[in-house]
């Protein structure tokens, strides 16, 4: 098809957006939730395929969750779907751990899951990025900061639903003074599991789930798997801790 460009001063013109959306094969939405829903409402044919990066459709039963590494079934659904919701950043790390463990019966659906995560500020929005990158940024931005203390983080619904958990997890996100990257940790209490699992067994469950993946790599148990204690890659790594007595 011939390429069509939306003139900059018409990019918020509903009629122009509607015309371009319906003339496209694929539409990528990088918009706030309300604007993403509006854009989807413009579709008037059956051939347009949409990939939405917002939170708007991640738990919508009419949409496919766009995490192909989770399973062959996920890959097949994405391949055939015309509506794909891109996973959230924290949710990607959380679900990559919980989904295989729930699926394999290691993690009970009713387990009281707690997750701790630290991330850079790039996903916090334009205002936050500007504040962090300002020459005169306030002193409080120099240190890690907790947020979403009301336990109502916008990623919680997808974290629960896609992982197959009966309840929303307790989630403690922290933003720090660096641009991008995150670490998501989920401690498991062995005495609360249905039976005893060693770190090696848990690692094997994760490895079997992701052994054919190009973008998820399961590391050996222990910090020695990380050179110098740091990761400098866009890949997703998982690694169980070797503390099997808790």
Language-model segments: which ranges?
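N-terminal Rossmann-like NAD(P) cofactor-binding subdomain of oxidoreductases
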Residues: 1-4, 8-147
């Amino acid at each position: 098809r011939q390429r069509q460009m939306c003139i900059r001063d018409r990019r918020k013109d509903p009629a122009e957006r509607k015309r371009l959306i319906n003339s496209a094969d694929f539409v990528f939405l990088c918009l706030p939730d309300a604007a993403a829903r509006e854009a989807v409402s413009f579709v008037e044919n059956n051939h347009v395929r949409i990939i939405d990066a917002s939170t708007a459709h991640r738990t919508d039963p009419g949409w496919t969750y766009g995490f192909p590494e989770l399973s062959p079934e996920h890959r097949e659904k994405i391949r055939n779907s015309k509506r794909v919701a891109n996973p959230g950043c924290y949710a990607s790390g959380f679900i990559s751990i919980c989904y295989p463990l729930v699926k394999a019966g290691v993690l009970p659906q009713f387990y009281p899951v707690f997750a701790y995560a630290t991330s850079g500020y790039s996903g916090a929005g334009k205002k936050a990025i500007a504040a962090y990158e300002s020459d005169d940024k306030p002193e409080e931005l120099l240190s890690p900061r907790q947020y979403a203390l009301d336990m109502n983080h916008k990623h919680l619904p997808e974290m629960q639903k896609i992982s197959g958990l009966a309840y929303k997890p307790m989630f403690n996100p922290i933003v720090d003074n660096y641009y991008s990257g995150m670490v998501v940790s989920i401690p498991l209490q062995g005495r609360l599991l249905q039976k005893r699992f060693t770190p090696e067994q848990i690692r094997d469950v994760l490895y079997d789930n992701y052994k054919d993946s190009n973008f998820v790599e399961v590391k050996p148990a222990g910090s020695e798997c990380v050179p110098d204690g740091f990761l400098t890659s866009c890949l997703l790594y998982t690694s169980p801790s070797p503390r099997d007595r808790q």
